[in-house]
Protein backbone atom coordinates (compact mmCIF):
# COMPACT_ATOMS: atom_id res chain seq x y z
CA UNK A 1 0.00 0.00 0.00
CA UNK A 2 2.82 2.37 0.93
CA UNK A 3 4.64 1.63 -2.36
CA UNK A 4 1.42 2.36 -4.29
CA UNK A 5 1.10 5.76 -2.63
CA UNK A 6 4.70 6.56 -3.54
CA UNK A 7 4.02 5.67 -7.20
CA UNK A 8 0.89 7.85 -7.21
CA UNK A 9 2.80 10.79 -5.74
CA UNK A 10 5.60 10.37 -8.29
CA UNK A 11 3.03 10.23 -11.11
CA UNK A 12 1.33 13.39 -9.82
CA UNK A 13 4.69 15.14 -9.54
CA UNK A 14 5.60 14.21 -13.11
CA UNK A 15 2.21 15.40 -14.41
CA UNK A 16 2.49 18.68 -12.51
CA UNK A 17 6.04 19.18 -13.84
CA UNK A 18 4.88 18.60 -17.40
CA UNK A 19 1.95 20.99 -16.94
CA UNK A 20 4.25 23.64 -15.46
CA UNK A 21 6.76 23.11 -18.27
CA UNK A 22 4.05 23.45 -20.92
CA UNK A 23 2.63 26.49 -19.17
CA UNK A 24 6.07 28.07 -18.99
CA UNK A 25 6.72 27.30 -22.63
CA UNK A 26 3.33 28.74 -23.55
CA UNK A 27 3.97 31.93 -21.59
CA UNK A 28 7.42 32.24 -23.15
CA UNK A 29 6.01 31.68 -26.63
CA UNK A 30 3.29 34.25 -26.02
CA UNK A 31 5.78 36.81 -24.77
CA UNK A 32 8.09 36.04 -27.68
CA UNK A 33 5.27 36.37 -30.21
CA UNK A 34 4.12 39.55 -28.51
CA UNK A 35 7.63 40.98 -28.74
CA UNK A 36 7.80 40.07 -32.42
CA UNK A 37 4.37 41.58 -32.99
CA UNK A 38 5.44 44.78 -31.26
CA UNK A 39 8.50 44.86 -33.46
CA UNK A 40 6.32 44.41 -36.54
CA UNK A 41 4.19 47.35 -35.49
CA UNK A 42 7.11 49.75 -35.03
CA UNK A 43 6.17 52.94 -36.83
CA UNK A 44 9.12 54.08 -38.93
CA UNK A 45 7.49 57.48 -39.43
CA UNK A 46 8.36 58.28 -35.80
CA UNK A 47 11.98 58.49 -37.00
CA UNK A 48 11.49 60.81 -39.99
CA UNK A 49 12.61 64.44 -39.41
CA UNK A 50 9.89 67.03 -39.87
CA UNK A 51 11.71 68.83 -42.69
CA UNK A 52 11.24 65.88 -45.06
CA UNK A 53 9.82 66.98 -48.41
CA UNK A 54 8.72 63.50 -49.49
CA UNK A 55 8.63 59.94 -48.18
CA UNK A 56 8.49 56.67 -50.11
CA UNK A 57 6.85 53.84 -48.13
CA UNK A 58 6.48 50.15 -48.91
CA UNK A 59 5.80 47.03 -46.87
CA UNK A 60 6.43 44.87 -49.93
CA UNK A 61 10.01 45.73 -50.76
CA UNK A 62 10.63 42.50 -52.69
CA UNK A 63 7.47 43.01 -54.76
CA UNK A 64 8.37 46.64 -55.43
CA UNK A 65 11.79 45.66 -56.77
CA UNK A 66 10.19 43.02 -58.96
CA UNK A 67 7.64 45.53 -60.29
CA UNK A 68 10.38 48.04 -61.16
CA UNK A 69 12.48 45.38 -62.89
CA UNK A 70 9.41 44.40 -64.93
CA UNK A 71 8.95 47.86 -66.45
CA UNK A 72 9.93 48.12 -70.12
CA UNK A 73 11.87 51.30 -69.34
CA UNK A 74 13.96 49.31 -66.82
CA UNK A 75 14.60 46.61 -69.40
CA UNK A 76 15.74 49.39 -71.76
CA UNK A 77 18.03 50.64 -68.95
CA UNK A 78 16.22 53.92 -68.29
CA UNK A 79 16.17 54.58 -64.56
CA UNK A 80 15.17 57.52 -62.37
CA UNK A 81 18.24 58.42 -60.31
CA UNK A 82 16.67 60.56 -57.59
CA UNK A 83 18.13 58.58 -54.68
CA UNK A 84 21.58 57.00 -54.47
CA UNK A 85 20.36 54.95 -51.52
CA UNK A 86 17.65 53.38 -53.65
CA UNK A 87 20.17 52.78 -56.45
CA UNK A 88 22.45 50.92 -54.01
CA UNK A 89 19.54 48.98 -52.55
CA UNK A 90 18.39 47.93 -56.00
CA UNK A 91 21.94 46.99 -57.00
CA UNK A 92 22.50 44.66 -54.04
CA UNK A 93 18.93 43.61 -53.29
CA UNK A 94 19.06 40.20 -54.95
CA UNK A 95 22.31 39.43 -53.13
CA UNK A 96 20.74 40.44 -49.81
CA UNK A 97 17.75 38.19 -50.45
CA UNK A 98 20.14 35.40 -51.42
CA UNK A 99 21.76 35.62 -47.99
CA UNK A 100 18.39 34.76 -46.38
CA UNK A 101 17.29 31.15 -47.04
CA UNK A 102 13.58 31.98 -46.61
CA UNK A 103 13.56 35.49 -48.08
CA UNK A 104 13.29 38.76 -46.21
CA UNK A 105 11.38 38.84 -42.96
CA UNK A 106 8.05 40.60 -42.85
CA UNK A 107 9.69 43.42 -40.91
CA UNK A 108 12.50 43.93 -43.43
CA UNK A 109 9.99 44.22 -46.25
CA UNK A 110 8.83 47.40 -44.52
CA UNK A 111 10.93 50.31 -45.80
CA UNK A 112 10.85 54.11 -45.97
CA UNK A 113 13.02 56.60 -47.83
CA UNK A 114 12.73 60.23 -46.75
CA UNK A 115 13.84 63.06 -49.05
CA UNK A 116 15.31 66.32 -47.77
CA UNK A 117 16.44 69.71 -49.04
CA UNK A 118 18.47 70.45 -51.03
CA UNK A 119 17.03 68.01 -53.55
CA UNK A 120 20.09 65.98 -54.55
CA UNK A 121 20.56 62.20 -55.00
CA UNK A 122 22.49 62.01 -51.69
CA UNK A 123 20.05 63.82 -49.39
CA UNK A 124 17.89 60.90 -48.32
CA UNK A 125 17.54 58.53 -45.38
CA UNK A 126 16.55 54.87 -45.76
CA UNK A 127 14.70 53.27 -42.84
CA UNK A 128 13.96 49.57 -42.39
CA UNK A 129 12.24 47.57 -39.65
CA UNK A 130 14.18 44.62 -38.23
CA UNK A 131 12.84 41.27 -37.09
CA UNK A 132 14.51 38.44 -35.19
CA UNK A 133 17.98 37.82 -36.66
CA UNK A 134 17.75 40.76 -39.08
CA UNK A 135 20.17 42.91 -37.08
CA UNK A 136 23.01 40.41 -37.57
CA UNK A 137 22.06 39.85 -41.22
CA UNK A 138 22.18 43.55 -42.11
CA UNK A 139 25.36 44.21 -40.14
CA UNK A 140 27.08 41.30 -41.87
CA UNK A 141 25.82 42.42 -45.28
CA UNK A 142 27.00 46.03 -44.80
CA UNK A 143 30.46 44.89 -43.72
CA UNK A 144 30.62 42.47 -46.64
CA UNK A 145 30.07 45.13 -49.29
CA UNK A 146 31.82 48.11 -47.74
CA UNK A 147 35.34 49.05 -48.71
CA UNK A 148 38.15 47.37 -46.82
CA UNK A 149 40.53 50.24 -47.62
CA UNK A 150 39.41 52.26 -44.60
CA UNK A 151 38.17 50.90 -41.28
CA UNK A 152 34.66 51.64 -40.07
CA UNK A 153 34.32 54.42 -37.51
CA UNK A 154 31.98 54.93 -34.60
CA UNK A 155 30.69 58.26 -33.31
CA UNK A 156 28.70 59.05 -30.21
CA UNK A 157 25.82 61.44 -30.77
CA UNK A 158 23.82 62.30 -27.66
CA UNK A 159 24.40 58.84 -26.25
CA UNK A 160 23.56 57.02 -29.50
CA UNK A 161 26.08 55.29 -31.76
CA UNK A 162 26.45 56.33 -35.40
CA UNK A 163 28.56 54.02 -37.55
CA UNK A 164 30.40 55.29 -40.62
CA UNK A 165 31.15 52.73 -43.32
CA UNK A 166 33.39 53.52 -46.33
CA UNK A 167 31.93 52.38 -49.66
CA UNK A 168 33.78 50.99 -52.65
CA UNK A 169 33.17 54.17 -54.69
CA UNK A 170 34.86 56.44 -52.15
CA UNK A 171 31.78 57.68 -50.32
CA UNK A 172 30.77 57.11 -46.71
CA UNK A 173 27.55 55.60 -45.39
CA UNK A 174 26.26 56.67 -41.97
CA UNK A 175 24.15 54.10 -40.11
CA UNK A 176 22.09 54.02 -36.92
CA UNK A 177 21.20 50.50 -35.69
CA UNK A 178 18.79 49.34 -32.98
CA UNK A 179 17.17 45.90 -32.50
CA UNK A 180 13.94 47.34 -33.98
CA UNK A 181 15.14 49.32 -36.99
CA UNK A 182 18.03 50.72 -38.96
CA UNK A 183 18.48 54.11 -40.61
CA UNK A 184 21.21 54.78 -43.18
CA UNK A 185 22.21 57.84 -45.21
CA UNK A 186 25.11 59.27 -47.15
CA UNK A 187 24.74 62.36 -44.93
CA UNK A 188 25.79 61.97 -41.26
CA UNK A 189 23.84 65.12 -40.33
CA UNK A 190 20.61 63.49 -41.52
CA UNK A 191 21.20 60.50 -39.23
CA UNK A 192 21.73 62.97 -36.38
CA UNK A 193 18.38 64.54 -37.27
CA UNK A 194 16.78 61.07 -37.19
CA UNK A 195 18.12 60.50 -33.66
CA UNK A 196 16.87 63.95 -32.59
CA UNK A 197 13.43 63.32 -34.10
CA UNK A 198 13.14 59.96 -32.36
CA UNK A 199 14.33 61.10 -28.93
CA UNK A 200 12.51 64.45 -28.85
CA UNK A 201 9.31 63.05 -30.37
CA UNK A 202 9.36 65.74 -33.03
CA UNK A 203 9.11 63.48 -36.04
CA UNK A 204 6.84 63.62 -39.07
CA UNK A 205 4.19 61.70 -37.13
CA UNK A 206 4.15 64.49 -34.54
CA UNK A 207 3.08 67.04 -37.17
CA UNK A 208 -0.69 67.52 -37.17
CA UNK A 209 -0.82 68.15 -40.94
CA UNK A 210 0.93 64.87 -41.72
CA UNK A 211 -0.72 62.80 -39.01
CA UNK A 212 -4.19 63.85 -40.20
CA UNK A 213 -3.37 62.83 -43.76
CA UNK A 214 -1.53 59.60 -42.95
CA UNK A 215 -3.76 56.54 -42.99
CA UNK A 216 -1.21 53.74 -43.26
CA UNK A 217 -0.47 51.49 -46.22
CA UNK A 218 -3.33 50.32 -48.42
CA UNK A 219 -3.73 46.77 -49.62
CA UNK A 220 -2.57 45.68 -53.07
CA UNK A 221 -0.33 48.72 -53.51
CA UNK A 222 3.36 48.37 -54.35
CA UNK A 223 4.32 51.63 -52.65
CA UNK A 224 2.99 54.94 -51.39
CA UNK A 225 4.66 58.32 -51.81
CA UNK A 226 3.87 61.20 -49.45
CA UNK A 227 4.71 64.60 -50.92
CA UNK A 228 4.74 68.00 -49.24
CA UNK A 229 3.25 70.09 -52.06
CA UNK A 230 4.49 73.51 -51.03
CA UNK A 231 6.54 75.78 -53.30
CA UNK A 232 7.27 73.74 -56.41
CA UNK A 233 9.79 74.96 -58.97
CA UNK A 234 8.39 75.13 -62.49
CA UNK A 235 9.98 75.12 -65.93
CA UNK A 236 13.66 74.92 -66.83
CA UNK A 237 16.66 75.81 -64.68
CA UNK A 238 17.72 78.26 -67.40
CA UNK A 239 14.55 80.35 -67.00
CA UNK A 240 15.60 83.76 -65.67
CA UNK A 241 12.34 84.19 -63.75
CA UNK A 242 12.62 80.78 -62.01
CA UNK A 243 8.86 80.49 -61.44
CA UNK A 244 7.42 78.63 -58.46
CA UNK A 245 3.90 77.43 -57.80
CA UNK A 246 2.34 76.95 -54.38
CA UNK A 247 0.40 73.73 -54.89
CA UNK A 248 -0.91 73.06 -51.38
CA UNK A 249 -0.25 70.82 -48.37
CA UNK A 250 0.58 67.11 -48.03
CA UNK A 251 -0.66 64.58 -50.57
CA UNK A 252 -0.28 60.81 -50.71
CA UNK A 253 0.08 58.79 -53.91
CA UNK A 254 -0.44 55.04 -54.20
CA UNK A 255 1.81 53.57 -56.89
CA UNK A 256 0.94 50.76 -59.25
CA UNK A 257 2.95 49.42 -62.18
CA UNK A 258 2.49 47.59 -65.41
CA UNK A 259 5.04 47.00 -68.14
CA UNK A 260 4.24 50.21 -70.03
CA UNK A 261 3.18 52.65 -67.32
CA UNK A 262 3.44 53.88 -63.75
CA UNK A 263 0.19 54.97 -62.07
CA UNK A 264 0.14 57.27 -59.04
CA UNK A 265 -3.34 57.74 -57.54
CA UNK A 266 -3.39 60.48 -54.92
CA UNK A 267 -5.45 62.23 -52.29
CA UNK A 268 -4.97 65.55 -50.47
CA UNK A 269 -7.05 66.28 -47.37
CA UNK A 270 -5.49 69.49 -46.10
CA UNK A 271 -7.44 72.72 -46.61
CA UNK A 272 -6.68 76.30 -45.63
CA UNK A 273 -7.35 79.81 -46.91
CA UNK A 274 -4.04 80.27 -48.73
CA UNK A 275 -4.02 81.10 -52.44
CA UNK A 276 -2.78 77.75 -53.61
CA UNK A 277 -3.37 75.82 -56.80
CA UNK A 278 -5.36 73.14 -54.98
CA UNK A 279 -7.52 75.63 -53.08
CA UNK A 280 -8.34 77.42 -56.34
CA UNK A 281 -9.42 74.11 -57.89
CA UNK A 282 -11.58 73.25 -54.87
CA UNK A 283 -13.90 76.13 -55.75
CA UNK A 284 -14.53 74.99 -59.32
CA UNK A 285 -17.32 72.83 -60.67
CA UNK A 286 -15.77 69.76 -62.37
CA UNK A 287 -15.83 69.51 -66.14
CA UNK A 288 -16.60 66.33 -68.05
CA UNK A 289 -14.71 64.49 -70.80
CA UNK A 290 -11.72 65.60 -72.84
CA UNK A 291 -11.29 67.76 -75.90
CA UNK A 292 -9.32 65.72 -78.41
CA UNK A 293 -11.55 66.98 -81.23
CA UNK A 294 -10.35 70.54 -80.44
CA UNK A 295 -6.63 69.70 -80.42
CA UNK A 296 -4.42 69.69 -83.55
CA UNK A 297 -2.83 66.32 -84.24
CA UNK A 298 0.68 67.72 -83.68
CA UNK A 299 -0.09 68.77 -80.09
CA UNK A 300 2.62 67.78 -77.60
CA UNK A 301 1.25 69.70 -74.61
CA UNK A 302 -2.24 70.62 -73.51
CA UNK A 303 -4.10 71.38 -70.32
CA UNK A 304 -7.68 72.14 -69.39
CA UNK A 305 -9.00 74.08 -66.39
CA UNK A 306 -12.43 74.31 -64.83
CA UNK A 307 -13.15 78.06 -64.40
CA UNK A 308 -16.63 78.27 -62.89
CA UNK A 309 -15.11 80.50 -60.17
CA UNK A 310 -12.86 82.92 -62.05
CA UNK A 311 -12.02 84.97 -58.95
CA UNK A 312 -10.39 81.92 -57.35
CA UNK A 313 -8.46 80.97 -60.49
CA UNK A 314 -7.09 84.44 -61.23
CA UNK A 315 -6.50 85.06 -57.53
CA UNK A 316 -3.99 82.21 -57.75
CA UNK A 317 -2.53 82.76 -61.25
CA UNK A 318 -2.02 86.51 -60.76
CA UNK A 319 0.55 85.73 -58.05
CA UNK A 320 2.89 83.97 -60.48
CA UNK A 321 6.18 85.77 -61.06
CA UNK A 322 5.93 85.71 -64.85
CA UNK A 323 2.54 87.49 -64.63
CA UNK A 324 4.06 90.34 -62.60
CA UNK A 325 7.37 90.71 -64.44
CA UNK A 326 6.25 93.63 -66.65
CA UNK A 327 3.25 94.90 -64.71
CA UNK A 328 2.06 98.52 -64.94
CA UNK A 329 -1.04 100.57 -64.12
CA UNK A 330 -2.11 100.34 -67.76
CA UNK A 331 -1.84 96.54 -67.80
CA UNK A 332 -3.55 96.29 -64.41
CA UNK A 333 -6.54 98.20 -65.77
CA UNK A 334 -6.71 96.01 -68.88
CA UNK A 335 -6.61 92.91 -66.67
CA UNK A 336 -9.58 94.25 -64.72
CA UNK A 337 -11.51 94.80 -67.94
CA UNK A 338 -10.70 91.30 -69.14
CA UNK A 339 -11.76 89.83 -65.82
CA UNK A 340 -15.18 91.46 -66.21
CA UNK A 341 -15.36 90.33 -69.83
CA UNK A 342 -14.59 86.74 -68.84
CA UNK A 343 -17.10 86.78 -65.99
CA UNK A 344 -19.81 87.89 -68.39
CA UNK A 345 -19.10 85.81 -71.48
CA UNK A 346 -16.79 82.89 -70.61
CA UNK A 347 -18.09 79.38 -70.15
CA UNK A 348 -16.80 76.99 -67.51
CA UNK A 349 -13.55 75.69 -69.00
CA UNK A 350 -10.40 76.93 -70.67
CA UNK A 351 -7.90 74.87 -72.63
CA UNK A 352 -4.39 75.70 -73.83
CA UNK A 353 -2.08 73.75 -76.11
CA UNK A 354 1.30 73.76 -77.81
CA UNK A 355 1.68 72.19 -81.24
CA UNK A 356 3.91 72.22 -84.31
CA UNK A 357 3.26 74.54 -87.23
CA UNK A 358 3.54 73.53 -90.86
CA UNK A 359 6.65 75.69 -91.14
CA UNK A 360 9.51 73.52 -89.91
CA UNK A 361 11.80 76.56 -89.67
CA UNK A 362 9.73 78.14 -86.88
CA UNK A 363 11.83 78.50 -83.77
CA UNK A 364 8.83 78.63 -81.46
CA UNK A 365 5.86 76.26 -81.33
CA UNK A 366 2.33 77.40 -81.98
CA UNK A 367 0.49 78.25 -78.76
CA UNK A 368 -3.26 78.76 -78.36
CA UNK A 369 -5.60 79.19 -75.41
CA UNK A 370 -9.25 78.35 -76.06
CA UNK A 371 -11.97 79.80 -73.79
CA UNK A 372 -15.50 78.44 -74.08
CA UNK A 373 -18.00 81.32 -74.47
CA UNK A 374 -21.72 81.36 -73.67
CA UNK A 375 -22.80 83.43 -76.70
CA UNK A 376 -20.19 83.91 -79.42
CA UNK A 377 -21.97 86.74 -81.25
CA UNK A 378 -22.54 88.78 -78.10
CA UNK A 379 -19.00 88.16 -76.90
CA UNK A 380 -17.50 89.34 -80.20
CA UNK A 381 -19.58 92.53 -80.20
CA UNK A 382 -18.51 93.21 -76.61
CA UNK A 383 -14.85 92.69 -77.55
CA UNK A 384 -15.11 95.08 -80.49
CA UNK A 385 -16.66 97.72 -78.23
CA UNK A 386 -13.97 97.19 -75.60
CA UNK A 387 -11.20 97.60 -78.16
CA UNK A 388 -12.81 100.77 -79.50
CA UNK A 389 -12.84 102.53 -76.11
CA UNK A 390 -9.47 101.26 -74.83
CA UNK A 391 -6.82 104.02 -74.81
CA UNK A 392 -3.48 103.47 -76.49
CA UNK A 393 -0.62 102.53 -74.18
CA UNK A 394 2.09 105.16 -73.96
CA UNK A 395 5.67 103.95 -73.91
CA UNK A 396 4.81 100.34 -74.67
CA UNK A 397 7.81 98.22 -75.71
CA UNK A 398 8.21 97.85 -79.45
CA UNK A 399 7.23 94.38 -80.58
CA UNK A 400 7.21 93.21 -84.16
CA UNK A 401 3.63 92.62 -85.25
CA UNK A 402 2.89 89.12 -86.46
CA UNK A 403 0.63 88.18 -89.37
CA UNK A 404 -1.89 85.37 -89.94
CA UNK A 405 -0.03 83.74 -92.86
CA UNK A 406 -3.25 82.82 -94.65
CA UNK A 407 -1.28 81.56 -97.64
CA UNK A 408 -0.07 78.63 -95.55
CA UNK A 409 -3.30 78.34 -93.55
CA UNK A 410 -6.06 79.29 -96.05
CA UNK A 411 -9.00 77.83 -94.12
CA UNK A 412 -8.42 80.29 -91.26
CA UNK A 413 -9.01 83.32 -93.51
CA UNK A 414 -12.72 83.72 -92.77
CA UNK A 415 -12.19 84.03 -89.01
CA UNK A 416 -11.33 87.61 -88.10
CA UNK A 417 -8.33 88.20 -85.85
CA UNK A 418 -7.84 91.02 -83.32
CA UNK A 419 -4.70 92.37 -81.69
CA UNK A 420 -5.45 93.13 -78.03
CA UNK A 421 -3.94 95.76 -75.74
CA UNK A 422 -1.28 94.37 -73.44
CA UNK A 423 -2.70 92.26 -70.60
CA UNK A 424 -1.69 89.19 -68.58
CA UNK A 425 -4.69 86.89 -69.07
CA UNK A 426 -2.91 84.61 -71.56
CA UNK A 427 0.32 84.76 -69.58
CA UNK A 428 -1.36 83.88 -66.28
CA UNK A 429 -2.84 80.67 -67.66
CA UNK A 430 0.03 79.60 -69.93
CA UNK A 431 3.21 81.20 -68.55
CA UNK A 432 4.06 82.53 -72.03
CA UNK A 433 5.67 85.99 -72.07
CA UNK A 434 7.22 85.75 -75.51
CA UNK A 435 5.13 88.57 -77.03
CA UNK A 436 5.70 91.08 -74.19
CA UNK A 437 2.05 90.55 -73.14
CA UNK A 438 0.63 91.39 -76.57
CA UNK A 439 -2.17 88.97 -77.42
CA UNK A 440 -4.01 88.02 -80.60
CA UNK A 441 -7.63 86.86 -80.50
CA UNK A 442 -10.27 85.31 -82.70
CA UNK A 443 -13.67 83.68 -82.24
CA UNK A 444 -14.07 80.16 -83.55
CA UNK A 445 -17.09 77.87 -83.20
CA UNK A 446 -18.19 78.78 -79.69
CA UNK A 447 -14.76 79.62 -78.32
CA UNK A 448 -12.52 82.66 -77.91
CA UNK A 449 -9.00 81.83 -79.05
CA UNK A 450 -6.02 83.73 -77.60
CA UNK A 451 -2.42 83.41 -78.75
CA UNK A 452 0.93 85.24 -78.48
CA UNK A 453 1.10 85.53 -82.30
CA UNK A 454 -1.34 85.65 -85.21
CA UNK A 455 0.09 82.61 -87.01
CA UNK A 456 -0.72 80.33 -84.05
CA UNK A 457 -4.40 81.24 -84.41
CA UNK A 458 -4.33 80.51 -88.14
CA UNK A 459 -2.51 77.20 -87.70
CA UNK A 460 -4.97 76.09 -85.01
CA UNK A 461 -8.11 76.95 -86.98
CA UNK A 462 -6.71 75.46 -90.20
CA UNK A 463 -5.89 72.15 -88.47
CA UNK A 464 -9.37 71.82 -86.98
CA UNK A 465 -11.07 72.83 -90.24
CA UNK A 466 -9.12 70.10 -92.02
CA UNK A 467 -10.00 67.49 -89.39
CA UNK A 468 -6.32 67.08 -88.51
CA UNK A 469 -6.99 66.50 -84.80
CA UNK A 470 -5.61 64.47 -81.90
CA UNK A 471 -8.86 62.67 -81.08
CA UNK A 472 -8.71 58.98 -81.96
CA UNK A 473 -4.92 58.69 -82.01
CA UNK A 474 -3.47 55.83 -79.94
CA UNK A 475 -1.30 58.02 -77.71
CA UNK A 476 -4.18 60.35 -76.88
CA UNK A 477 -6.66 57.55 -76.22
CA UNK A 478 -4.18 55.72 -74.00
CA UNK A 479 -3.52 58.89 -72.04
CA UNK A 480 -7.12 59.92 -71.39
CA UNK A 481 -8.10 56.30 -70.84
CA UNK A 482 -6.00 56.29 -67.67
CA UNK A 483 -7.77 59.37 -66.23
CA UNK A 484 -11.18 60.14 -64.73
CA UNK A 485 -13.76 61.68 -67.12
CA UNK A 486 -14.64 64.23 -64.39
CA UNK A 487 -11.92 66.63 -63.29
CA UNK A 488 -11.02 70.18 -62.32
CA UNK A 489 -7.65 70.25 -64.08
CA UNK A 490 -5.91 67.93 -66.53
CA UNK A 491 -2.62 68.10 -68.40
CA UNK A 492 -0.83 65.84 -70.89
CA UNK A 493 2.69 66.43 -72.12
CA UNK A 494 5.16 64.64 -74.36
CA UNK A 495 8.32 65.31 -72.36
CA UNK A 496 10.74 64.69 -75.22
CA UNK A 497 9.07 67.44 -77.28
CA UNK A 498 8.67 69.72 -74.26
CA UNK A 499 12.38 69.66 -73.53
CA UNK A 500 13.08 71.13 -76.96
CA UNK A 501 11.00 74.24 -76.31
CA UNK A 502 12.12 77.70 -75.11
CA UNK A 503 11.89 78.52 -71.41
CA UNK A 504 8.85 80.79 -71.73
CA UNK A 505 6.72 77.97 -73.17
CA UNK A 506 7.29 75.30 -70.50
CA UNK A 507 6.48 77.07 -67.21
CA UNK A 508 3.46 74.90 -66.44
CA UNK A 509 5.58 71.74 -66.15
CA UNK A 510 7.32 71.08 -62.79
CA UNK A 511 11.07 71.60 -62.82
CA UNK A 512 11.55 68.09 -61.38
CA UNK A 513 10.79 66.56 -64.78
CA UNK A 514 13.39 68.75 -66.51
CA UNK A 515 16.08 68.07 -63.90
CA UNK A 516 15.68 64.37 -64.61
CA UNK A 517 15.30 64.76 -68.37
CA UNK A 518 17.37 61.64 -69.18
CA UNK A 519 14.56 59.56 -67.71
CA UNK A 520 11.36 61.52 -68.31
CA UNK A 521 12.03 62.28 -71.97
CA UNK A 522 11.01 58.69 -72.62
CA UNK A 523 7.50 59.31 -71.28
CA UNK A 524 4.22 61.00 -71.99
CA UNK A 525 2.99 62.39 -68.68
CA UNK A 526 -0.65 62.83 -67.71
CA UNK A 527 -1.58 64.83 -64.60
CA UNK A 528 -5.10 65.30 -63.28
CA UNK A 529 -6.74 66.93 -60.25
CA UNK A 530 -10.31 66.00 -59.35
CA UNK A 531 -12.18 67.62 -56.44
CA UNK A 532 -15.16 66.13 -54.60
CA UNK A 533 -16.67 67.33 -51.31
CA UNK A 534 -13.59 69.37 -50.45
CA UNK A 535 -11.14 66.52 -51.03
CA UNK A 536 -8.65 66.75 -53.90
CA UNK A 537 -7.58 63.65 -55.82
CA UNK A 538 -4.38 64.25 -57.81
CA UNK A 539 -3.36 61.55 -60.29
CA UNK A 540 -0.12 61.13 -62.20
CA UNK A 541 0.44 58.65 -65.03
CA UNK A 542 3.77 57.97 -66.76
CA UNK A 543 3.28 56.32 -70.16
CA UNK A 544 6.47 54.83 -71.59
CA UNK A 545 7.10 55.66 -75.26
CA UNK A 546 9.75 53.04 -75.98
CA UNK A 547 13.21 53.24 -77.44
CA UNK A 548 12.51 55.12 -80.68
CA UNK A 549 13.43 58.58 -79.46
CA UNK A 550 15.69 60.82 -81.48
CA UNK A 551 18.50 62.94 -80.13
CA UNK A 552 17.65 66.56 -79.46
CA UNK A 553 19.15 69.82 -78.41
CA UNK A 554 17.38 72.07 -75.93
CA UNK A 555 16.49 75.45 -77.36
CA UNK A 556 17.36 78.40 -75.17
CA UNK A 557 15.18 81.46 -74.87
Regions found by a protein language model. Give the residues of each.
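Composition- and surface-driven signal marking solvent-exposed, interaction-prone regions
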Residues: 196-198, 267-269, 278-281, 316-318, ...
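Active-site proximal loops enriched in glycine and acidic residues that flank catalytic Cys/His/Asp
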Residues: 268, 305-307, 371-373, 451-453, ...
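Short, structured motif recognition centered on aromatic/hydrophobic residues
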Residues: 55-56, 124-129, 181-185, 366-371, ...
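Structural boundary/hinge residues at secondary-structure and domain interfaces
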Residues: 7-15, 19-164, 211-240, 263-366, ...
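Short, Lys/Arg-enriched N-terminal segments with co-localized hydrophobic residues
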Residues: 1-3
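Short, surface-exposed beta-strand/loop "edge" segments at domain boundaries and coil↔beta transitions
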Residues: 134-140, 171-173, 191-193, 270-279, ...
